[in-house]
Regions:
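N-terminal organellar transit peptides
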Residues: 1-287
Length: 287
C-alpha cells in the first residue's frame, strides 16, 4: 500500500517514473505472466487455477500499468470466479495465493462469493507461499485451505494510521487552513494533531472490521469466534507447522501436491459407488 501511495504522490507532483523502475516493472510483468500461464496449463482435467497475487485492492488493476503488476483486484477476481462457476468444463477451482494482503474494501464481498461458490463446486486454496491479512480472509473462505512447506499465513487483524504533519509544516513556514462543511468532515486530517474523539472513532471503525474479519475466519475454519480472537486472530504471521497446529489450514502441501489430490478426488467421484468414507480417506492424505 505504501508503494501505491508513493506512485500516486509521484503522479500528483508530475514526476515521471525512473527508467530503472520501468525496466524492473516490465521484468516483473514477464515473471507474473509466466506464472499465470503455468497456472493456465494446470487448468486441465476440469481443474481451473485462479491466481491471487500481490496487494489486494478493490480496483488494483487501475494502477497496474504504472506501478507494476503487483496487485489483485477483488472485482476482477470475483468476475473470473463467476465465469469458472458457470463453465461446465470446470469441476474444481484452485486459488493460488501469494499475497501480503491489502485494503479491506471488497474483501468481505469476495469471501462471501467464495463461500457461495463452494456450494456449487469445490474451491480449494493454497498459500503459495504467503496468505496474510486480506489474503488469508479470502483463502480461509475456500472449501479447503493449504500452505506450502515454506509458506506463511495469518496476520488476522486490522490497522489504520494517522500522520501529523503540522510540526513539519510549521517548521517549513507552511500554514494550512481547512475550509469545510459538516462537523466531522476534516476529522483525522494530517495537518493537525489527532484529538481523542477522532482517535476513538477511528478505533471503532478498526474494531468493526476486525469483528467482521474474525467472524469470517471462524465461519471459514469452522471454529468459535472466541477461538479465533484468543489464538490465531492476534495479528501474527505463522509458518506452516504452527499454522496447522492452530487449525489455520487443513494441511501442508505444494501447489502440485494439491493439484494431484484434486485429480485423485475427481477420479474417485467419477467412479460408480464412490463413498464418503473413501473421500474422507483421500482428504487425510495430505495431513
Amino acid at each position: 500500500l505504501n508503494a501505491l501511495a508513493a506512485v500516486v504522490m509521484r503522479w500528483s507532483a508530475g514526476i515521471p517514473a525512473e527508467s530503472e523502475n520501468m525496466i524492473r516493472i516490465q521484468a516483473d510483468r514477464v515473471i507474473r505472466e509466466s506464472r499465470r500461464q503455468t497456472a493456465a496449463v494446470q487448468s486441465s482435467g476440469g481443474i481451473a487455477v485462479l491466481p491471487l497475487y500481490g496487494v489486494v485492492t478493490q480496483r488494483g488493476n487501475m494502477v497496474d500499468d504504472v506501478s507494476g503488476p503487483g496487485s489483485t483486484s477483488t472485482q476482477q477476481f470475483s468476475s473470473a470466479l463467476r465465469q469458472l462457476i458457470a463453465d461446465d468444463t470446470v469441476g474444481q477451482i484452485l486459488i493460488d495465493i501469494d499475497s501480503p494482503g491489502g485494503s479491506v474494501y471488497g474483501v468481505a464481498e469476495l469471501a462471501d462469493e467464495i463461500q457461495s461458490a463452494r456450494a456449487q463446486k469445490p474451491v480449494i486454496a493454497v498459500a503459495n507461499s504467503l496468505a496474510a491479512s486480506a489474503a488469508y480472509w479470502i483463502g480461509c473462505s475456500a472449501s479447503e485451505f493449504y500452505v506450502t512447506p515454506g509458506g506463511e499465513v495469518g496476520s488476522i487483524g486490522v490497522w489504520q494510521a494517522h500522520q501529523d504533519y503540522s510540526k513539519a509544516l510549521e517548521d517549513a513556514g507552511v500554514k494550512t487552513t481547512l475550509i469545510s462543511a459538516g462537523r466531522f468532515k476534516v476529522e483525522g486530517n494530517p495537518y493537525s494533531p489527532l484529538d481523542a474523539d477522532a482517535q476513538s472513532f477511528m478505533q471503532s471503525r478498526v474494531d468493526d472490521y476486525y469483528a467482521a474479519f474474525t467472524k469470517a475466519v471462524a465461519r471459514g475454519r469452522g471454529v468459535p469466534i472466541s477461538q479465533v480472537r484468543e489464538g490465531m486472530g492476534q495479528g501474527r504471521v505463522l509458518g506452516a507447522d504452527a499454522a496447522l497446529a492452530q487449525n489455520m489450514v487443513d494441511g501442508i502441501a505444494t501447489l502440485d501436491d494439491v493439484i494431484k489430490k484434486m485429480r485423485r478426488n475427481a477420479r474417485q467421484l467419477s467412479k460408480p459407488g464412490a463413498t464418503r468414507l473413501r473421500q474422507a480417506r483421500d482428504a487425510l492424505a495430505l495431513l
